[in-house]
Amino acid sequence: MLNFKLLKTDGNARRGQLTLNHGVIETPIFMPVGTYGSVKAMSPLELNEIDAQIILGNTFHLWLRPGNDIIAKFGGLHEFMGWNKPILTDSGGFQVFSLGEMRKITEEGVHFSSPINGDKLFLSPEVSMQIQRVLNSDIVMQFDECTPYEIDGRPATTEEAAKSMRMSLRWAKRSMDEFNREENPNALFGIVQGGMFENLRDESLAGLEELNFHGVAIGGLSVGEPKEDMMRVLEHVGPRLPANKPHYLMGVGTPEDLVAGVASGIDMFDCVMPTRNARNGWLFTRFGDIKIKNARYKDDKKPLDESCSCYACRNFSRAYLHHLHRTGEILGARLNTIHNLHYYLDLMREMREAISEGRFQLFVSQFHADRARGS
């Protein structure tokens, strides 16, 4: 089940509401990444406390471990991981294509060796849909080939990007056919590919619109390309996505990327950056980023961000977080993760409010001024 209501627009920025089988999501929204059915360093209780509305699971990794047979015994991923709100699962395509020499791509699908034990495995649009049916994720992603930015150390050519994109379109049709054959009651999103070429992106989008997916994602960005190329493609594709469907920008990115994405009409984002950076002591705040390992914070009594209401900022100093990071305490990674995800989710809340009140451009100007000010 999917119902998307567009509540308000402000320029290309959109305020919406997405109804799924496990709940209602207010958009624009950020989705914390739970690769193995767990958002690293966070319990479902803590995710609820920071108002996470939807999380992302990884089809490829969950298929390898614990395996579909285990998750099937629980009736799906929600019951298995103790999370009762919506879940989006990616198709596994990006992970398979990241295996490099360990995989062989054919029209049928991808043959590869398991990175865990070397077993010979095969993933195709049909297999991906079957796995995601067992996971019972609220949003299922089509199986696609993520066009790399570079091939053999040089940017992909138009011909290479076109060949990859057109195979993804054929796989989109097979994904849709299998999704319907499985009688999956959830939502299926198509993925726009085409590399750095606007005309190929347009061709991909036109092909997906014929298939009438429940939502549309932009894939193949933040894969090593220069930031100006990413923004050029985003600003071209975002406003062209169908207005009556949710728009998802995959694997992006920094706070600045999220604001730019919303300005281009994006409704949904995911990225490992807030959780991964948290574990490495890189913290995002309203007034710029903090690298908590730096000696300047060893006796700093201030909270990370005086404007932040997260558990870490309400209770602990920068000096204490510096100490936890320096000593490798698990609590440090946990508090840092709580803060970074709270910051990302609060940023999305502020953008929703700004769009609703017709002041999004003013918000963008203030956001950049604050981030440039420094902490």
From Swiss-Prot:
Binds 1 zinc ion per subunit. It comes from the Bacteria. The active site is at D90, D270. It is an enzyme of class 2 (transferase). Zn(2+) binds at C308, C310, C313, H339. GO terms for biological process: queuosine biosynthetic process; tRNA wobble guanine modification; tRNA-guanine transglycosylation. Pfam families: TGT (PF01702). This is Queuine tRNA-ribosyltransferase. The gene is tgt.
